[in-house]
């Protein structure tokens, strides 16, 4: 299994699939799956290519989810090896996307292949949902596929997302949920004027200071047994023309909240509006909800994944809901149990991104064993 996974991972890495350009990665995957009798369906939206592949027609539906797109490489001269050469040095596979997430994608594909070869008449359905739009806008990828599947009554019961979840060793962390993410673009109005004549102007920065203090110090909740407390961070702030003698006419503040299941996006919006009105500010605010929080409590999927890690890798994982958002947030809307398990995340989005070849082989075995645990032999 190891050589098959590594060879496929190298093939995928050598395709410079900067989001949302798939560069033929999904075609390679589709051709492999077709040979095993998978039904292949292409769901393309705008510049994004999405693949929905299935083997079987009954319940439960066990899906693997992942993405073929990668982030830009940055200055390629800073890499020890060309970022799309997929070189292996001391058992480490180097390249953009090696850890995030072409390595785990290869492990998923080979695990599914091996399982189907051994169990051609398996129970349930094995599915793969693969997109080329995860790293950038994430507007035409998994979310659109999920919407299409739900519209025609298709469901997913269990889904493993191959995002790089591991911290210090393979399998030490399994993500069983994610916080929600909501961004506010706030415009506070003032009256522009000359700094020497402040009585003829109204400085929105000065007016907003007490509000900003309250916004950044407010305790939204205390978290719970599954999630850390909700946090807010100001990401961008701007006012003025660049001149030192002009009072700005508008203050722009962009802030983001990563929120847990103790609050809702509506509560957040209402509380911010309440603060703004309390401080008598004239404003406009635009909200962007990237995703609601989701949680998979201990059940069939988590048990299957944990048992696979213990039997194959000899490790009992920590369950965690921290970090950023993932496409799991869209799949959870289907009512599916969703967990994330993938390689180490220490080098993702960095120069010299890499993954252990040994880890990829182990990951493939873990994924295959998960299928055995859920669908039987």
Curated annotation (Swiss-Prot):
Coiled coil: none
Protein name as catalogued: Succinyl-diaminopimelate desuccinylase
Pathway: Amino-acid biosynthesis; L-lysine biosynthesis via DAP pathway; LL-2,6-diaminopimelate from (S)-tetrahydrodipicolinate (succinylase route): step 3/3
Example of a GO MF term: acetylornithine deacetylase activity
Keyword Hydrolase among record annotations: yes
Reaction equation(s) it catalyzes: N-succinyl-(2S,6S)-2,6-diaminopimelate + H2O = (2S,6S)-2,6-diaminopimelate + succinate
PANTHER family: ACETYLORNITHINE DEACETYLASE, N-ACETYL-L-CITRULLINE DEACETYLASE
InterPro entries xref list: ArgE/DapE_CS, Bact_exopeptidase_dim_dom, DapE_proteobac, Peptidase_M20, Peptidase_M20_dimer, Peptidase_M20A
Organism per entry: Mannheimia succiniciproducens (strain KCTC 0769BP / MBEL55E)
NCBIfam families according to UniProt: dapE_proteo (TIGR01246), PRK13009.1 (NF009557)
Residue numbers annotated as active site: 69, 134
Keywords, sorted A to Z: Amino-acid biosynthesis, Cobalt, Diaminopimelate biosynthesis, Hydrolase, Lysine biosynthesis, Metal-binding, Zinc
E.C. code: 3.5.1.18
Family: Belongs to the peptidase M20A family. DapE subfamily.
Residues annotated to bind Zn(2+) 2: 100, 135, 349
Cofactor(s) named in the record: Zn(2+); Co(2+)
Function: Catalyzes the hydrolysis of N-succinyl-L,L-diaminopimelic acid (SDAP), forming succinate and LL-2,6-diaminopimelate (DAP), an intermediate involved in the bacterial biosynthesis of lysine and meso-diaminopimelic acid, an essential component of bacterial cell walls.
């Amino acid at each position: 299994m190891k050589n098959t996974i590594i060879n496929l991972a190298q093939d995928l890495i050598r395709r410079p699939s900067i989001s949302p350009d798939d560069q033929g990665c999904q075609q390679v995957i589709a051709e492999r799956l077709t040979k095993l009798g998978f039904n292949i369906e292409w769901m393309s939206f705008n510049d994004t290519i999405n693949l929905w592949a299935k083997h079987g027609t009954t319940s439960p539906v066990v899906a693997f989810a992942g993405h073929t797109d990668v982030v830009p490489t940055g200055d390629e001269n800073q890499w020890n090896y060309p970022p799309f050469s997929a070189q292996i040095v001391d058992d480490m596979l180097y390249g953009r996307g090696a850890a995030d997430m072409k390595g785990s994608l290869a492990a998923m594909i080979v695990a599914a292949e091996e399982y189907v070869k051994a169990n051609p008449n398996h129970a349930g359905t094995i599915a793969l949902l693969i997109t080329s739009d995860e790293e950038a806008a994430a507007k035409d990828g998994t979310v659109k596929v999920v919407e299409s599947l739900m519209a025609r009554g298709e469901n997913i019961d269990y889904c493993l997302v191959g995002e790089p979840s591991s911290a210090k060793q393979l399998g030490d962390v399994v993500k069983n949920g994610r916080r929600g993410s909501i961004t506010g673009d706030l415009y506070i109005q003032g009256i522009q004027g000359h700094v020497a004549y402040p009585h003829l102007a109204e400085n929105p920065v000065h007016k907003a200071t007490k509000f900003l203090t309250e916004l950044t110090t407010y305790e939204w909740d205390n978290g719970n047994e599954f999630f850390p407390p909700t946090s807010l961070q100001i990401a961008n702030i701007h006012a003025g023309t660049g001149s030192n003698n002009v009072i700005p006419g508008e203050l722009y503040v962009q802030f983001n909240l990563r929120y847990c299941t103790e609050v809702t996006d509506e509560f957040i919006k209402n509380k911010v509006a309440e603060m703004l009105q309390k401080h008598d500010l004239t404003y406009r605010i635009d909200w962007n909800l990237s995703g609601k929080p989701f949680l998979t409590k201990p059940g069939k999927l988590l048990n299957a994944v944990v048992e696979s890690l213990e039997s194959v890798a000899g490790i009992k994982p920590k369950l965690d809901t921290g970090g950023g958002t993932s496409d799991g947030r869209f799949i959870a809307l289907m009512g599916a149990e969703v967990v994330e398990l993938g390689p180490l995340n220490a080098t993702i989005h960095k120069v010299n991104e890499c993954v252990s070849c040994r880890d990829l082989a182990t990951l493939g075995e873990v994924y295959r064993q998960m299928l055995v645990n859920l669908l039987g032999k």
